[in-house]
Amino acid sequence: MNSMNTYSPLYSSYENINIYKKNRKFEEDNYETSTANISCDSKGRILVKESENDRNESIQKKQMLSSMDNRKTNKSEKHNISSYYKMRKKASNHLKDKEKLNNNIIYAKNPHANRYDKYYSLNMNIMNNMNNMNNMNNVNNMNNVNNMNNVNNMNNMNNVNNMNNMNNVNNMNNVKSMYNNNNNSNVYYRISRQNINGKERLLNRYNIMRPQRSADMLIRNYLYNDLPYEINQQNLNKNINDNNAGSFDNLNKTVFENYNKNILDEYNRNIMQYYNSNLKNYRNSSFDNIYTRYNNNNNNNNVYSNNNVYSNNNIYNNNNNNDNINNSFQFSKQEGLMKIYSNNNRNMNDYVVKTSNITRAADNTCAQEQINIPTYNKTVLLKSSPNTENTFNKTLSNILKEQPKRSSMFSFNSSDFFKDFGKLRKNFVGKKKNKINKDIVINGNIFNNKIIDNNTSNAKSEGNSTLHKIYNFIFPSSVKKLQKKKQKLQVIEDKEKNSNRAVVMPLKNKIIYINDANITNDKFKHSFENYNYHQTNIPFVSVTNYMNKDSTKNVRSFSSFDVKERISPRVIRNGNINNNKNNNINNNNNNINNNNNNINNNNNNINNNNNINNNNNINNNNNINNNNNINNNNINNINNINNDFVNDSNINKTVNIHNNNNNLNNYSNTMKSVAKNTQKLSAQKNSLVNDKHHTYHEKLITNIYQFTGGQSQKSCNIKNQNVKEEKINNTQISYINNTAYNDYTNLPNVETYVLSEKSNNLENKEDNNINEKFKNDNNVDKKNNDENNIIKHNVNQNNNEVIVMNNQTEEQINDNKFIKPLNNITGIDPKKKNIYNTVMHINDKMDLNKHDYNYNYNNIIPHNYINSSDKMTNNSLHINKKADDIFQNMISNNDTNVPCVYVNKYINNIFQNNNPSNVTNYINTINMNKAPITIDENSNKLDNNINYENVTKNMIYNNYTNNNVLYITKEKSDNKLNNSTNHLNDLKNNYYVINPSLLYIHNNNNNIEWNKQYTNNFSKPNFLDKFFYEKKVESIQPHHLNQYYYNNQNVKYNPSHINILENKYVNQFTNQNENSLYNFTTHHNNIKNNNIDNILLLDKAIRNQSIYYNNNKGDDETKSAEHTTNPSINLLKNNYEDKNKSNYVHSIVSITDKDNSIYAKNKYAEVVTKNNEKREDAIHKKDEQYIFNNNDNNNDNIHNNNIHNNIHNNIHNNIHNNIHNNIHNNIHNNIHNNIHNNIHNNIHNNIDVSSRENFFQHDIQNTNQINNKTILDITQNEKPNATNEKCLDINNKEKKKKKIKSVHYDMDEILSLKCKVYDELDTCLKCINNLTKNKKLYEQLKKYKHKLDKDTKTKKLYDECTSEKTGSYYTMKDSYISSLLCNEYKLNHILNKSNNKVSDDKHILSYNHHHNKNNNINDINNIKHISKFVNKDNEKTLNNINILNHNNKDPNSGVFLPSDNTESVIYNMNRNRKLCDNNFNVSKHVLYKDSKGTDSTRTNFYDDYSMSYVKSNVDNVEKKEKIKNNINISDKYFLSETDSPYIGKKKALMITLNYNGLLEGCVNDTVDMCDHLMQRFGFNDFILLNDCNLCYRNFVTQKANKKNILSNLHNFIVNSNNGDILFFYFCGYSIKLIDSKFTENYNFALLPQDHSKNNYIYSNEIFNIIKKLQGGKQLCIIFDTTYTSYFVPVPTSITYNKNMNTTEIYKYNNFSSNQKYLKSLKTFGKIRDRNVDSIFVENIKKPLLYEIYKKENDTNTNDKIILVPSIFFFSPDCNDRNDFEFSIKNKVRGLLTYCLGKAIELLKNDFSYHDLFVAASQILIDIKKEYNLKYVKFKLSFLNEYSPDDIKFLSHESLFLKKKLQLDEPLWKPSLKLNNLNQYIQDICNMDERKMLKSSKKKCLLIFIKDIKFYTYKNIDTKNEYFVSCFIKNKNVNILCVRRNNTKEQRIVQDKIFFLEYITLNVTHMENANIYVELFKKKKKNYFVARSIFNIRNVNGKFSLSDEKKNIIGIIDLNIKCVS
């Protein structure tokens, strides 16, 4: 659990304060605070008074002092443990986590030993006595290093001389020369002295100035740490040989190994006692309080150079410029040996700021500038001595083992700690002998007191700036305040002005700081790195030192650097070689010879090891960060690189300043720009609000973070925050290390990797060619450009990088680099992840005043993308820029790098691009990540070749290479659409709200190209909502929906192409006269190639020209028409070649049958191609409209074609469009000709216009009002011409217009090129689709066809009036009733009746083929049938229809039948039946239903192959009909519950709440669940309630406030009908409400959208609504939230036992809970809770009593069995308290919904609720293992009428289940496996069998359990009671088992438990069944102990008991009997 300030407005102040106190308690062991001094504001910010901070500080000081006293007086350490002091820093409120020490502190050598020695004037005799040494006789050697080395019996003084000669320029072997204390050449100083104008200035708090001897320091600081040290030499002697280095190394090693440790321990203890007694202000004896000074050097010119040695000591060399220079080892006593912090521990860092001074020699000819070198506190891991028993041994592994859960990621912006460095410097200069305020210097650091006091938030909030970004994004107003108060982070020193101010660079807190100064002997380095120290994986970093530009000004510069992952030791050195000596530095393997001119006083010119050259990812000797290079004429200087500047997207470490004095001004300017840029970002990161009385915590919203699929949750996917703005001059820009480089054609493909948890550092490979380009790039413009584009410091730090050492190859480096992050969820090697992050700014005319901001709701914007919503610049948005500049500035220099154009603080707003000139509404959400981040390589393959130039060109022409662009042209828009869009515009302009676009939700596997491009994008393509689906267009131009094809990358669309095609077709028609006839032939190649443009234009040409064909060839065409085989006839006769062996006619009706639909589409395309010529012949038959032939044979052929074409169209085309297009063209081409010509015209239209148009989903809705041969064709772009006007009847004047009913389009299916049609298929066609194998049916169809042919002699065409559709346009499969009509017997029965004819459309009540007067009802509700005929005596009927149409204004008042697929025979209302009785005398033939609900739609889902299940039941119904000859249709088809239940519709209520992005996964969960419901289970009625404007397909969303949720739920439950399947889904937050008055009475609640007003949805409110569910309804509820208890009236629940692979039933006891409230575990990182912490609310209404649903007593004794509702409730188990969101495959998902969805995908079609629950639970187990989850378990609750294993999931099977007999508990039964639905219905519904069941005797097993004897007491607790439970399980059956306390609890007596009880088990099948006997331990929760499994055939005996690990622990003795 991370110690984060999880404060939220959703919490109460009390909860927030408790969280704060808990976190502080966790961070600081001794933290205590008073609640009275802490408060919380309304936004969740914690306010702590300063007095409280001061009090805590004083308390902690006292505690630290007392702990030190205890440490000193610990007797147990007196002899065995050395007196290393434990250095604990002051844990104040200021420092908190930044300086909180790890408990694992390694005790270091006391650094105060020098003073102790000096005070007592230790001589050599004392040392000899103490160390038992006999060979140190020379008194003069007491201060010599050799004397201490002689402790190890080293008699050879030459060893020491050799060691000293390394630094001795004069090669002086005289040891006595080292002892000259006057020159202070061998005195080591605690802290560096700065000699300014001959005056001493000390960083000394206590003014202690003691010399330190080299002998003491060598021993105390090096010899006992097993750390070889390196010697620095200011003036290197070229004649140093290898022997000296080797001898010194051997000496050092030997000294350590042979030194007596115990003596040193005793010595150190005496030192501590002395030192502590002399301190006036004794404070923990910390090294931070000790500062020693040194005597002034006699030499005037001293050069002090610091170097970083592995021993954590600074070497200060006092060099005399005279010839007599004594170079000796000078080690500062400053640090001594300190505690060690491991890199993986959290809050362990040191901040010690010291300075040293390097003065310029008087005779320096190069005019070197004075260099001010900062030195840093350093820590190393001390290697334990060989005597492990007597030492305090703590290694890195031990540290990591003790606290493995501590977060290893810790970062902060150290620049906050150095803001007032200049003020401190003034204190030092002006008051050198006065005490420095301890508040200013704390632990060697320099702080601002106010800032420290204000910094009260913990380390996590400070370090993880991403949380600040989120907070700033959500609460941008506070950011404005913070920006006003931000502090300056850097003070740039100018040479002439402000000389007293200091240059402060941001400092990263890292583990080990190595200050290298003047270490030039590579042999030493080599020997050091090859020493055994490299065995420990300790991270090291180097400090880059900066130049001082003025010798008289003391200017400090602080470097910023990273800790690299330790592979092998590495020291990066700063060569500070005097110009006079002409020395060369030989790097280890590089052998880079740099002249002195290139090296003098350039602290940031680093001579790197060869490993840098070996790694392309690390900068080779060239500074790649050329933004910081100040180029001069010295090319060699450019070769110097920053030692810290490894390729890291987050690092802007140092600035290379070369030694030319001319460049110093450039350096100053560059540093200024760095300061300005860094100031912005750092201030944003650690923004503090000062207040006199309170300190404001940065409020962190609960549960906000980002899932990046393998990356840290606190890092963005790619951070291009530091990318500079650079124009793209027709060249591709590559961003390496976030620095823009022009592509010189040598740039390789840049591969980026996920490097660390804290930040995604782009480690890019690069060629040396790039470096060569920049070497020679000395252009002034380039230099200025670089200065102005300094890469800013990234907020996040990286603690997990790799420093590549000497002998590593590039490949090894890459392998080492990818240390798997902790949060790498996907487990994929980051090396394989290609991350491309290109932000494409598309909009060039953004109007910010309208708040048109782009936002995609499918992707809640990750917080790391947002720095500050108010800091957006024009560079980022490209406001008011030219089109050419847009793409040249796609990536700007802004801090933000979001994958969308603009991020506005108004989350609910959506960006809308400006419309094209001809577009009314253009909504485009462009996928900004053209090459999205690839986390799952299998699911997404990127197109890496993105050509920005081409993209730019396409964008200019509005031809976006993006499939989610929808154009709606002005010409095509109808009135309703305009009204809708105007309403949207009003909302946008007045309320700044834009209706969001639909979320693209289907990943269609059939469309490969689409999946390649948009599989795992953050922003799925968006489509418009219902308003833009309802589009009515007559296709004059290419339909707007086909813009998808034109914009598709596969289709190269030229805007002028359509005009060319149009002209091509129009020019073929020479005459434009109305009566002209033309020959027209289609283009075979165009149709063959499926050229969309040509086909659409062909349709247009036909429509525009009202094409008539030449009648000169009429006779020939007539003859050819007789012998032409139409494709539809081939389909009907099944003559065409079909590879499908089953001869199954593939239907394009089914949505779910994807393969069949695509196959049918492709087959149809082939048929169209093969029969193209035949179709052309069919087109020419239109000339027969003027040549009418009365030949009966001709008529038969015509009508044959008519029938077949109708069938063909109904199979392959959209029925709506067929009718409208057919009728439309029919009227256009009809000028009062006879009916046969109309038939021919319909045939041509079917083949040539509608089918082709519908095949390409060119769905166009024409509003048709049909009455007395009247058709009103209303479009905005085409009016009825003169010919059409002639076709209108006189009754047009009496016809009233009805409202336009738009056609809904499935946009998703259009894009995937799937052919979908509406549900109103004819009965005959349903038979073809589903029962093609029935040969008898084909015979019936043929008979029916011949009878229809006879009706062609009729003379008039009666038009059909369309009924208002009440159902969805989505296609569902055939219903239960339609199969009855399709049955062969039923069809034969209907066809044989003379007066009762049912047409091929199921909605036609009847039509008469004979000359009867009163039964002339003609196709009242048919919208698909093309030609219906009546006799001459039909005028009365026609008049009746006119009366109905005139009198009944209500569209529902007319006689019509529902148009949905599954309700085809259960018809509307009794009023319709009465209308039919009064007007048409056909009441006997009206199919009706007794409807309770307002919606008459009924749906059912069956497979194409599942209809056979109902066949036998249909046969039974038919047999009864044969007996009753005179039964009417209504009686025959009225389905009572006894015979076969009514099959209702399926409805879903989906509630989604993401609380402005707090729960990202809810949107994904809802979309995924809707996909399953619609595609798999046939749901077509969705009610969407959400707070994020989520639209699914054409279903419009509503706000998810409390009122809407409760009202919709009430209507959802109450208005349902018997047989309905209801699905209720909720995903969001739940909360526990606790009444302060009644602490024991608590209640759970859901948080709606308006929860801020305390509008909670209480559990009893949901409970009481669901309790109203009655009748034969099935309700499935899924609550994907944490608190789900008592929301649903289901008394029985199931949980899954993974050990048994079975499920366990438990029941609630009157819904009373005795469980204690357990606070859910808050987790951050991989998962996140879906609940809010409990809150206390006053005056909560006491929950109503929960009453379990009880069936009302029914006294009716009829045969109808009352159906009882079945309720199934999926939810997290409240006992395990948690429900989570988690990230998987780069998407955030809810745990429960994801597991259920995956289980649905894995299971077959037939699975029960119990099967689904078991599968989901098993998936959960795998997820829990992967994500290390514990407290998660699912629960399935259900009503006790039926078992979840009885009912199939979301099927109508529950309707056939009858009430079960009450069996004695326990209720055990096997799972009922059905062979087919019909068999199951017969078994359950048969009355005779039911009677037999009542009289039958029960079979049961009596199991007599005697005793259990144990073999072992290993897992047996004799204090607890035990009981035995038994159940029966059949093989291969996943049963529902109920475990009960079937025996009484018994205790163990000796080694046995005696039960002597019977257990009764009810059984149905005795064969192949196993009995499970299990032993449980009785506690608050029963614990499984062991089980025994044996076959049911066994009668008695003893059986072994085995535990979970299958270890036998005892034997159970029992007997079994079977009774009945």
From Swiss-Prot:
- What switches its activity on or off, per the activity regulation note? Ca(2+) does not appear to affect catalytic activity.
- EC number, as in UniProt: 3.4.22.-
pH effects: Optimum pH is 7.5.
Tell me the domain of life.
Eukaryota
Q: Which GO terms describe its molecular function?
A: cysteine-type endopeptidase activity; peptidase activity
Gene3D superfamilies, alphabetized: 3.40.50.12660
**Function field:** Protease that cleaves specifically after arginine or lysine residues. May play a role in parasite growth and/or development.
Q: Where in the cell is it found?
A: Cytoplasm
Q: What is this protein called?
A: Metacaspase-2
Signal sequence, renumbered to the chain: none
Q: Sorted alphabetically, which InterPro entries does this protein's record hold?
A: Metacaspase
The chain's disulfide connectivity reads none
Q: Where is the composition biased (Basic and acidic residues)?
A: 51-60, 69-78
